Every structure is written in C-alpha cells, then in structure tokens.
Design a protein with these regions (language model features):
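Hinge/beta->alpha junction and helix N-cap segments in small-molecule ligand-binding domains
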Residues: 42-55, 70-80, 101-102, 125, ...
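Short, low-complexity disordered leader/linker segments with a strong preference
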Residues: 1-38, 111-118, 348-354
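Short acidic/histidine-rich motifs immediately flanking catalytic phosphotransfer sites
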Residues: 88-95, 118, 216-220
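Bacterial carbohydrate/catabolite-sensing allosteric modules
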Residues: 135-221, 239-253, 269-270, 294, ...
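Extracellular/periplasmic ligand-binding modules, especially the Venus flytrap/periplasmic-binding
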Residues: 225-237, 267-268, 274, 278-299
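Flexible loop/hinge segments that line or gate small-molecule binding clefts
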Residues: 68, 104-142, 150, 160, ...
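Signal peptide-proximal N-terminal region
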Residues: 56-71, 186-190
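Hinge/cleft segment of the Venus flytrap/periplasmic-binding protein
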Residues: 35, 172, 183, 187, ...
C-alpha cells in the first residue's frame, strides 16, 4: 500500500514514541537476549496511520516470538531500502522483513540477499521478480471487488463513481484498480467509473475529486484505494455541501481501504460508508512468524493455514499468505453477495489500537 499523505492521529503519536523507545531508526533492538535470532525489519514509511500502526505492533510480536530486532525506515525510497539492507547485512541479521513500495526496483536487493542466504519476507507488496521466503499480504483484488459490490448495491446499478487510484507501479494499486473495473463492467454496467491516478498522494486525490464533482455534480460514489485520501475527500465533500447523512439524498457513498481507527469512526458518524480492514496487526505478526520459520529451516506449501488464511503459489518458487481483510460497514449487512462486519466489531484491529 504505497501512500504519501494521510491522517495523523493518536496512532501516529504512539508510533513516534515506539520508534524512539524501541527502534532507534536502524540501531535499536526490541530484544536484548543474546540467544535470540537477530532479524531486521525495514518500515516502508511513517507518514500514514496504517503504517504507523504496523510499526507499533512489530516490537511486541518480535518479543513474543523470541526474536531480537533491528529496524530501519526506507521512507518510500528504494535507494534507502537498498542502503538499509546493507546496514542489516553488516549487523549480521538472520532474516529481513520489508514492504518494498517499488515492486520492480527492489529486484537487485533481493538478489543480493539471496546470494548471502538471508531469507526475506515481504509485507503488503509482492515483488515483480526475485526470490522471497514468503509474501504476507491480503488479497488486494478482493479489495476492489468488495468496494465495487458495495457501491454497486448502494447505487442500485446506476450512476457515476470516482475511483481514487493508488500507484499503478505497485501490485496493490494495479490489483485494486483492475478488480474494481472488472467488477463494475461485469456486474454493474450502468455505472460510469471515473478512474483518477493519484500515486497515493492525498493532495492530488482531493484536487481530482473536486474537479470531477464540479464537472459531474451527479457523482454518487467514491472509492478511495486507501486512507491516504480520507481527509481530503471529506474536506471536498464538505466544501461541496455533500457531506450529508446517509439518509439524505445528497449523500455520496464513500468506500475506503485500510481499516484505520479514523475510518471506523467516520463510518459510525455517517461520513463514509465502508472500508476494507487491512490487517496491520497480522502483517506485523506473520512477517516475523515467517522469518523465524525460515531461520528454523521450515518450509510451507499452498493451502489453508491455521490462522484463517490461504497460502497460494503466485509463480514458481513464490508463496503468498493471503490474510483475511473483511468489508466493514455500519450495519454489518451483505452487499452484492459480500458479507461485512459492523464498524464497532471488537475483532477489528482499528478498534483496539490507539
């Protein structure tokens, strides 16, 4: 989930404290045991609530799994990711978890780590090429499908919607965009989709949404491919007089992806209508779980797991554990055959964080 700008909330403050106390930007360790295997985790960015939540979860899970931890932050820069990998190598880590935002440019770094027999687990993104021990992410095509089915149901198969696309140079942006478009063409051909490239930039998303609403005031739906666009979307709708209660005919139905606390609050308040909860907590947990498994010499095969997910083979030699990511709505209803959970459900990580 490549993102640039997003909400700053309590989770951000907690993440900053966690970085200072537990991480130290590449020099900190969350476990001091000399017997604990040393692993490196590169955080992809710290400018969004989702990734700041992931950052706060990581040290705790490392401790639970008996791992000693070194961390870096590549700040959405593949050159920094490459440099951080070199730092980890010099520190003698036994495995590395990373979330490469440029899924093509990371290939040389993966090749170097493979040559040094350092296993890699990628989180949220799947490299376009190169070898990793496991990819830990949710089914991002399902994100686009679920958003489509929700909006298609709410609009009764007719009308106009704006899709604020993520970066199409990332597998996540491509998966969500293609799946949403495919679903609309297949299931709701009466809905016109305005696809807007934003490169995960909230300011760009807000500007393009404003332009679309000015030219097409009858737009009744917005699909934000992540919470990077939440603040800007709400601001634009408010300026246009469209931030109305769901029962009001002026209401514009909004679906997001991430499941951050602010999204859940916005659903409860009637400001947005749905999100897909991307599991920040489970990303942290299973990234480290698979690193420890790699260090211990374990192997895996495609199939169901013991944690309500499915491992698939995406290409020869590359496995992906697709974690559960539910549709979240106010009423917990079923939309276009897609079940949802209520926004106040205590099982959602966004209701137990911050």
């Amino acid at each position: 989930m490549r993102l640039r700008t997003a909400l700053r909330s309590t989770a951000s403050a907690l993440a900053a404290l966690a970085l200072l106390s537990a991480c130290g930007s590449g020099t900190g360790a969350s476990s001091a045991s000399g017997d604990a295997p040393l692993v490196g985790v590169d955080y992809p960015r710290s400018d969004t609530d989702f990734w700041n939540s992931y950052i706060t979860y990581t040290p705790g899970y490392a401790g639970q799994l008996g791992l000693s931890l070194k961390t870096t932050n590549s700040q959405n820069d593949v050159a920094k990711l490459t440099a951080n990998a070199q730092t980890f190598i010099s520190q003698g880590v036994k495995g590395i978890a990373m979330a490469p935002q440029d899924t093509a440019a990371v290939a040389p770094t993966l090749a170097q780590l493979e040559a040094k027999k350092i296993p890699v687990v990628t989180i949220d993104t799947r490299p376009d090429s190169g070898k990793v021990f496991m990819v830990v992410r949710a089914d991002n095509r399902a994100y686009g499908e679920k958003a489509c089915q929700f909006l298609g149901t709410k609009l009764k198969g007719e009308g106009k919607v704006v899709m604020l696309e993520g970066g199409l140079d990332s597998i996540n942006g491509r998966d969500r965009t293609e799946a949403f478009n495919d679903c609309m063409k297949r299931s709701y051909p009466g809905i016109k989709v305005f696809g807007e490239a934003t490169n995960w930039d909230g300011a760009v998303a807000a500007q393009k949404l404003q332009t679309d609403l000015t030219a097409n005031p009858d737009i009744k739906g917005v699909y934000m491919q992540s919470s990077f666009a939440l603040a800007g979307t709400l601001q634009v709708l408010k300026q246009k007089g469209l931030l109305a209660d769901p029962s009001d005919e002026k209401h514009v139905f909004v679906v997001s992806n991430d499941g951050i606390p602010e999204e859940l609050k916005s659903i409860a308040a009637g400001k947005i209508d749905a999100t897909v909860s991307q599991p920040a907590d489970l990303y942290a947990k299973y990234a480290l779980h698979y690193l420890k498994a790699a260090i211990d010499g374990k192997t895996f095969q495609p199939g169901k797991t013991d944690h309500d997910s499915t491992i698939i083979q995406v290409r020869p030699g590359l496995l992906e554990d697709q974690l559960s990511a539910p549709l979240v709505t106010l009423d917990g209803g079923t939309y276009g055959g897609v079940p949802s959970v209520k926004s106040d459900d205590p099982s959602l990580w966004g209701n137990n964080h911050g």
